[in-house]
C-alpha cells in the first residue's frame, strides 16, 4: 500500500494517468532491466559486458512470467477454527514437511515458512 501511495504521489504531477491508478493495486509480471533484459524471479540480470551472457548468444533468454511469489500473494487468507494449524503444502510428494503454526493472537496471521500460505483464526 505504501509503495502504491509513493508511486501515486510521484506521478501526481502528470495528471489523469496517475489518478486512474487504483490504490492498493499490485503490479504483477516480469520486470525489465535498463538494458531491456528480462529479470528473473531471483533478480538475475547481467551487464552488457558480463561474460555470463555468453549462454544466451544465438538464443533468447526465457523467463517464466508466473513468479510463484506473485501466485501465492493472490491466494486469500484461510480462516480456521483451531488455535494451531498444520500445513504440509498439499501433502504427498508435491508438498513440504509438516509445520505447525500458532494462531494465538486475534490480529495474528500465520504464514507458512515453506509455501507462504496464510492462516487466521476465526474467533466466535
UniProtKB/Swiss-Prot annotation:
Q: Which domain of life is it from?
A: Eukaryota
Which GO BP terms, alphabetically?
mitochondrial electron transport, NADH to ubiquinone
Task: Note the Pfam families from the entry.
Answer: zf-CHCC
Topology in the lipid bilayer: Peripheral membrane protein
An example GO CC term for this entry is:
respiratory chain complex I
Spans traversing the lipid bilayer: none
Could you tell me which InterPro entries the record lists for this protein? NDUFS6, Znf_CHCC
Task: Work out whether the entry's keyword set contains Thylakoid.
Answer: no
Q: Define the transit peptide region by residue numbers.
A: 1-28
Q: Which UniProt keywords apply?
A: Acetylation, Electron transport, Membrane, Mitochondrion, Mitochondrion inner membrane, Respiratory chain, Transit peptide, Transport
Subcellular location field:
Mitochondrion inner membrane
Q: Which residues carry this modification: N6-acetyllysine?
A: 98
| Role summary | Accessory subunit of the mitochondrial membrane respiratory chain NADH dehydrogenase (Complex I), that is believed not to be involved in catalysis. Complex I functions in the transfer of electrons from NADH to the respiratory chain. The immediate electron acceptor for the enzyme is believed to be ubiquinone.
- Subunit structure, as described in the record: Mammalian complex I is composed of 45 different subunits. This is a component of the iron-sulfur (IP) fragment of the enzyme.
The record's comment on protein family reads: Belongs to the complex I NDUFS6 subunit family.
Q: What name is this protein filed under?
A: NADH dehydrogenase [ubiquinone] iron-sulfur protein 6, mitochondrial
Q: What is the lineage of its organism?
A: Eukaryota, Metazoa, Chordata, Craniata, Vertebrata
Name the gene that codes for it.
NDUFS6
Amino acid at each position: 500500500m505504501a509503495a502504491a501511495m509513493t508511486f501515486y504521489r510521484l506521478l501526481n504531477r502528470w495528471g489523469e494517468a496517475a489518478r486512474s491508478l487504483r490504490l492498493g493495486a499490485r503490479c504483477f509480471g516480469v520486470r525489465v532491466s535498463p538494458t531491456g533484459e528480462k529479470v528473473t524471479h531471483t533478480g538475475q540480470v547481467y551487464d552488457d559486458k558480463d561474460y555470463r551472457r555468453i549462454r544466451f548468444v544465438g538464443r533468447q533468454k526465457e523467463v517464466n512470467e508466473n513468479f510463484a511469489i506473485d501466485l501465492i500473494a493472490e491466494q486469500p487468507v484461510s480462516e480456521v477454527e483451531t488455535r494451531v494449524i498444520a500445513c504440509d503444502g498439499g501433502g504427498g510428494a508435491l508438498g513440504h514437511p509438516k509445520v505447525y503454526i500458532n494462531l494465538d493472537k486475534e490480529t495474528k496471521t500465520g504464514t507458512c515458512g515453506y509455501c507462504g500460505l496464510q492462516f487466521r483464526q476465526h474467533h466466535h
